[in-house]
């Protein structure tokens, strides 16, 4: 008899206490991952247990081992046995330029700080030149995550929580979930090549429309929803068959020139009766892509940097693509200023706490979209198995039994608390730097302990006056 631990969720299987060997299980009882994900944590004289179902290509368990210190060994083993590319959930865990390497300068005498409790403006306008700008009470909102990747309960809780903070909820690329939209304070509809939920009514009852060109974890690829997540309700929204994989094209077939994109923006602006129209791009060819976007005359542009997450993306792409968010934002702000553009700039990709957001505001962003942070507030425990459909907490799943585990009322309140705390803390960052609005935060408030950040942004190094 031995004791094992699931490397995904940490569940313990003590064979003696449970009364049967690990090999008799089909999957982890908590996260539903295969028992090959268990590792032995107590040595016994007994022969190590192995999975009852093995491939002829599996490595001999008497010699196979895991060693995170050997670059890509486990990934190569998995690809070699399965014959398929690896898909992974959430964001990269590789070393990244960190928001924690940027520090704020607290005001003392020149300038002086504000007093505790002094009023600070957090109101945020997206698309100020649009006929019907979107007005939020905070510069933070919940980013695009689809119904399909997430459960109905999770999407609705996120929307209700965003409404508690008087900020926006985004649809994601899976079309509009009516319960989510009804709960929203402000709603941003994502317009994708598959045209899910594109009707005159949906365009005129959303508060902004965002054309999705790409996302940070899989730039140049369309979204993918595995068939096991395509329930009758999701199939109806997307106009697809139940149980079949859903793949979005990697690009709009009707966009082949700047003029084509401009026509799309103008058409959506007309159909939506003047709602702000945005364009979302992954951070890659930043300046060239921004020039293309500006020619289309959008009301806002969203840039998705390296460090962001998704329910499932090709592991090899996630680990090898996209400009890190700090550098992407710096380059975008510089380019837009050089062009004299006043388009609203939104950033997403790895920002979670108020200090991240305050620093992004100081670098010149108008608003920040958060995804992983909001999911954590709702209940996500980072099992990182979103694509499996077996999320133990009922968030990234369509399994009816798993969905019951998410208390929607509690999740909504937690999301609301999270967003409201972020907003209050942003006010504090404004006060300690002597600013009456969070949108007055600027580069003069920043310094960095990273020479790379100092060399490739305008943030000064802490060792220099």
Residue ranges with predicted function:
Residues 137, 144, 149-267, 271-278, ...:
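Active-site-facing alpha/beta catalytic cores
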Residues 17-26:
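Short linker/helix segments within small regulatory modules
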Residues 33-34, 41-140, 144, 149-160, ...:
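Conserved, well-structured core domains of diverse proteins
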Residues 15-16, 37-38:
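Short, non-ligating residues that shape and space the ligands of small metal-coordination modules
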Residues 7-8, 29-30, 390:
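Short, cysteine/histidine-rich loop/knuckle motifs that typically chelate Zn2+
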């Amino acid at each position: 008899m031995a004791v094992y631990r699931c490397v995904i969720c940490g569940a313990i299987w003590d064979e003696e206490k449970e009364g049967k060997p690990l090999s008799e299980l089909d999957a982890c009882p908590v996260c539903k991952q295969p028992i090959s994900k268990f590792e032995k944590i107590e040595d016994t004289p007994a022969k190590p247990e192995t999975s009852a179902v093995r491939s002829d290509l599996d490595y001999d368990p008497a010699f196979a081992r895991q060693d995170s210190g050997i670059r890509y060994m486990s990934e190569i083993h998995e690809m070699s046995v399965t014959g398929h590319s690896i898909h992974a959930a959430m964001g990269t865990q590789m070393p990244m330029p960190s928001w924690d390497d940027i520090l704020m300068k607290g005001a003392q005498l020149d300038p002086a700080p504000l007093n505790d409790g002094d009023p600070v403006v957090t109101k945020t306008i997206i698309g100020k030149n649009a006929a019907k700008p979107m007005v939020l009470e905070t510069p933070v909102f919940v980013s695009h995550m689809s119904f399909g990747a997430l459960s109905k309960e999770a999407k609705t809780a996120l929307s209700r929580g965003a409404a508690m903070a008087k900020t926006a909820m985004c649809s994601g690329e899976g079309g509009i979930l009516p319960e989510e939209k009804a709960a929203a304070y402000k709603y941003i509809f994502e317009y994708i090549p598959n045209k899910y939920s594109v009707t005159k009514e949906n365009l005129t009852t959303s508060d902004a429309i965002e054309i999705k060109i790409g996302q940070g974890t899989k730039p140049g690829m369309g979204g993918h929803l595995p068939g096991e997540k395509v329930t009758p309700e999701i199939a109806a929204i997307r106009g697809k068959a139940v149980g079949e994989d859903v793949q979005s094209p990697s690009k709009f077939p009707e966009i082949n020139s700047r003029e084509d994109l401009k026509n799309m923006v103008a058409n959506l602006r007309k159909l939506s009766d003047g709602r702000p129209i945005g364009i979302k791009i992954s951070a890659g060819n930043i300046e060239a892509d921004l020039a293309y976007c500006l020619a289309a005359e959008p009301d806002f542009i969203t840039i998705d940097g390296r460090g962001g997450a998704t329910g499932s993306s090709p592991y090899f792409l996630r680990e090898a693509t996209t400009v890190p968010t700090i550098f992407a934002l710096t380059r975008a702000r510089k380019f837009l200023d050089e062009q004299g553009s006043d388009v609203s700039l939104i950033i997403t990709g790895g920002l979670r706490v108020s200090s991240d957001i305050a620093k992004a505001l100081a670098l010149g962003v108008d608003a920040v979209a958060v995804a992983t942070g909001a999911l954590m507030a709702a209940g996500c425990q980072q099992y990182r198995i979103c694509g499996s459909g077996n999320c133990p907490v009922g968030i990234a799943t369509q399994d009816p039994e798993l969905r019951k585990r998410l208390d929607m009322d509690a999740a909504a309140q937690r999301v609301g608390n999270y967003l409201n705390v972020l907003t209050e803390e942003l006010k504090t960052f404004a006060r300690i730097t002597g600013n009456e609005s969070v949108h007055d935060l600027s580069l003069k408030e920043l310094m960095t302990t990273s020479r790379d950040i100092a060399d490739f942004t305008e943030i000064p190094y802490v060792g220099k006056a």
